[in-house]
């Protein structure tokens, strides 16, 4: 395969190396961490690449329970906090304006049948929502040409009773979006988890962008794209993945730092050499692979995140994530 120069300092491409489960475990580096996040302790602001995202901030909240009222409430770029009460059926996606917080009420509010779209906006928080069965071509949440986004404590789900293309992605981030944190969410029963970077042919728009942090998420019975990242820089830490075929996928020169995650009943925990003409890069440390294999053809230069964070050891991740991730856990 040809090699795309990495977004961080260039390096010569190493010979392809497929790392076995045993070798990966032996090479795992124990990361130095501060105090671990306590289970379910919801942050008041995002950690990671999405740091500084405030959404509607301290704006007075409005509560809606119908689709018409929701569409009106999230329109425009003035600061706003919109509370969703109950489950609203969609047949497509609703566009969300800049400087918006969308917050579910209780543990069972949200949307089904479609999703939310963040297109050419900035400073948006999506929190405490149930988002289910986004019928194609709608994603559960689409982040497109947008910056400063926090996706936190939501429950995304579909089913695997239909063809893999019947539903679209649960969370897709594309078209040069940047500075995104995805934290404390559950992703369940789907073929396609989170696609970051939609096409091998979109280097001109995506290179230097798609900086995304995924932490403390639970992926259960999700076949692949956990996440799939092209061109960008991804930090995937303290996540719990079970029942996947292919989990973390770095491609088209993307840089992935994968640390302190737990994988169970998963075939391939990390791959850098599938499905694209250009391999990605990955660094692994402190992970509990649980018997999963890794396919790391290129070790990357992204070894240290450019922000402060407290990663907990893999030994406590399952307890923290299963008790703290998803809607209704704020």
Tell what function each PLM region has.
Residues 1-41:
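Secretory targeting and sorting signals
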Residues 47-83:
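Acidic Gly/Asp/Thr-rich repetitive segments characteristic of extracellular carbohydrate-active
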Residues 71-78, 86-103, 109-128, 132-147, ...:
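Extracellular beta-strand-rich solenoid/capping regions of secreted or surface-exposed proteins
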């Amino acid at each position: 395969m040809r090699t795309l120069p990495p977004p961080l300092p260039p390096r010569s491409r190493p010979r392809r190396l497929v790392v076995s489960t045993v070798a990966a475990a032996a090479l795992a580096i124990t990361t130095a961490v501060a105090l671990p996040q306590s289970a379910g302790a919801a942050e008041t602001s995002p950690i990671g690449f999405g740091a500084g995202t405030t959404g509607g901030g301290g704006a007075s909240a409005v509560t809606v329970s119908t689709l018409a009222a929701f569409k009106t409430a999230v329109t425009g770029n003035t600061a706003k906090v919109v509370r969703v009460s109950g489950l609203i059926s969609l047949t497509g996606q609703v566009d969300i304006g800049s400087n918006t917080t969308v917050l579910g009420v209780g543990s069972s509010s949200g949307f089904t049948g479609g999703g939310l779209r963040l297109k050419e906006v900035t400073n948006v928080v999506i929190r405490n929502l149930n988002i289910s069965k986004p019928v194609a071509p709608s994603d559960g949440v689409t982040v497109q040409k947008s910056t400063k986004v926090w996706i936190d404590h939501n429950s995304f789900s579909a089913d695997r009773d239909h063809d893999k293309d019947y539903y679209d992605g649960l969370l897709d981030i594309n078209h040069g979006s940047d500075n995104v944190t995805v934290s404390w969410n559950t992703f369940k029963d789907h073929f396609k988890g989170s696609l970051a970077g939609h096409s091998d042919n979109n280097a001109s728009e995506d290179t230097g962008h798609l900086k995304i942090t995924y932490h403390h998420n639970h992926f259960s019975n999700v076949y692949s794209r956990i996440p799939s990242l092209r061109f960008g820089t991804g930090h995937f830490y303290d996540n719990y993945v079970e029942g996947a075929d292919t989990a973390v996928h770095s491609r088209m020169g993307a840089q992935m730092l994968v640390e302190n995650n737990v994988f169970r009943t998963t075939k391939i925990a990390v791959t850098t050499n599938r499905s694209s003409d250009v391999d990605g890069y990955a660094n692994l440390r402190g992970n509990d692979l649980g018997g999963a294999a890794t396919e790391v053809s290129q070790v990357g230069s992204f070894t240290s995140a450019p922000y402060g964070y407290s990663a907990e050891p893999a030994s406590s991740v399952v307890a923290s994530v299963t008790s703290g991730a998803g809607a209704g856990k704020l």
